[in-house]
Amino acid sequence: MMKPFFKTKLFGFAMSVLVLSCLVFGSGAKAWASPGGSNQLGFSAEVEGMDDLNTPGATGTMFYGGGVSIQYWISPGFGVRLGADYFNNSKSTGPLPQNILPFYSGLMVNLLSGSLGSLDLVGDFGQVLNNGVDNTYFDAGLQLNTLLSDRRQFFLDVRFREDGVGTMATPWEFVTAGLGISFF
């Protein structure tokens, strides 16, 4: 007989696979190889991993989580976005907070675009909650997009993040990598 814990985990996994399958294989109206388009609204969701770069005593500390953003492409080469991420610490003790929750707004610039995908430069500023304590936030990175299906894109992004810019003597620095899906 299965224990309730395993039933819950199995049910959660099955529902995740079902939802992702519907998102990926559902039908849309148009295909976009690049997210850039005039007056184009989009939504994205991703899973992310984050590694600390500069905090003494935090060697081997990884954060994991995900995020969502709403983006609006003003022209084919320039867009703005609003987003929020959530990261949970892999260790229960150490100098870094147990959870990090950045809220940000930023710019997206399309660097390269082709029939199969595009490369965007992204940069964001905002506020972050570290265990509920407010601080400043900055990130910059690259996002590689490829066509997934009609009006959907798969993307990989890599970002450099700073937590505590201008408020801490040495801001926490992280590098993150994420995989996600954008809808237009």
PLM region spans:
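Ser/Thr- (and often Asn-) enriched beta-sheet segments in non-cytosolic proteins
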Residues: G42-S44, T136, F160
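Gram-negative (and chloroplast) outer-membrane scaffold detector with strong preference
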Residues: G67-F154, S182-F184
